[in-house]
Amino acid sequence: TKPDEGTVLFDGMTDLTRLDETRIAELGIGRKFQKPTVFESQTIEDNLLLALNVDHSVKGTLFWRGSRDEAERIDRVLETIRLTDARYRLAGSLSHGQKQWLEIGMLLAQDPKLLLVDEPVAGMTDVETHQTAELLKEINKEKTVMVVEHDMTFVRELGVKVTCLHEGTVLAEGTIDQVSS
């Protein structure tokens, strides 16, 4: 969604409102929407391989040979999203929460600077919600993560700075307790 007015600066200088989705991704911004979009008829590993930043042209795809670095990156992503033991399972067989984690992994495979995550725990069990909070906190040690979420219990578990918006205007900013009062 494009804003009605104003600018959105990335790295302090690039106005994202003037760019298309491809260029935004090329800058290192990974976006994950509420409903998971994974290739259900492919394995978890294949989903991650498809997400790698490689030449996806016809020629590039036909002659692509995975490098050791790419294999190691896939291994690291699988470990991060806690799906190593399921790497050869079809994505369609995963629970809703696991599909969300796979999609987060697909973003990580692209090595973004910033992850924008919309409603990551919608439809998850309490256990999956807790595991997702742990996953995002782990990712946030190395990457910038911005979460849009209505589940305040989950937001509290993240333990991060909160910005409360209403129709594009900042209403409050601070800890969850400060914003809630």
What feature does the model see in each segment?
Residues 155-157:
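A short, surface-exposed alpha-helical micro-motif characterized by mixed small hydrophobic
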